[in-house]
Amino acid sequence: MIIKNLQEFYPLLIPNAPLIAIDYGSKKLGIALSNQERNIAMPLNTIIEINKKIVITSLLSIIEKYKVCGVVIGLPIDMSGAVTEQTNIVMKFAEELAKSINLPIYLQDERLTTKAANNFLKSFGVKRKDRNNNDDAVAASMILETVLDSMKKL
């Protein structure tokens, strides 16, 4: 079930179970995981794959392994808030994932997170190739951190 309102998403979550976040791109997906208390977001890994069936199978494995209770997907919208082609691609992916899992899926505005993640890694002297391999997972953790911080206020 896809949910666009955090106030509706939060009550559906099982206590003491982590969330997973996805930064969905055309060539790779960044994955982040919260701790069970849902107060820390950590980059987990990057899936470099364009076949959606393989991507969903990989995500199902991660969801099962970590006993995840909900999914956050970064929703790319342009700076004015308008829907873009990439927004529609991510929405379609979210719909496909929703058919495969019985967990709530929350769509979180992800404007500028990949750029911020890349700048963050650059500030630590991470080389360009390594930044490009890890920026999506770091972006996913930033998306998840935004959600975790917002949930604390509910």
From Swiss-Prot:
Domain of life: Bacteria
Gene3D superfamilies: YqgF/RNase H-like domain
EC number of the protein: 3.1.-.-
InterPro entries: RNaseH-like_sf, YqgF, YqgF/RNaseH-like_dom, YqgF/RNaseH-like_dom_sf
UniProt subcellular location: Cytoplasm
EC category: hydrolase
CC per GO annotation: cytosol
GO biological process: rRNA 5'-end processing
CDD domains assigned to the protein according to its UniProt record, in alphabetical order: YqgF
Gene Ontology molecular function, alphabetical: nuclease activity
Pfam families: RuvX
Keywords annotated in UniProt: Cytoplasm, Hydrolase, Nuclease, Ribosome biogenesis
SMART domains in UniProt: YqgFc (SM00732)
Family, as annotated: Belongs to the YqgF nuclease family.
Function: Could be a nuclease involved in processing of the 5'-end of pre-16S rRNA.
Stated name of the protein: Putative pre-16S rRNA nuclease
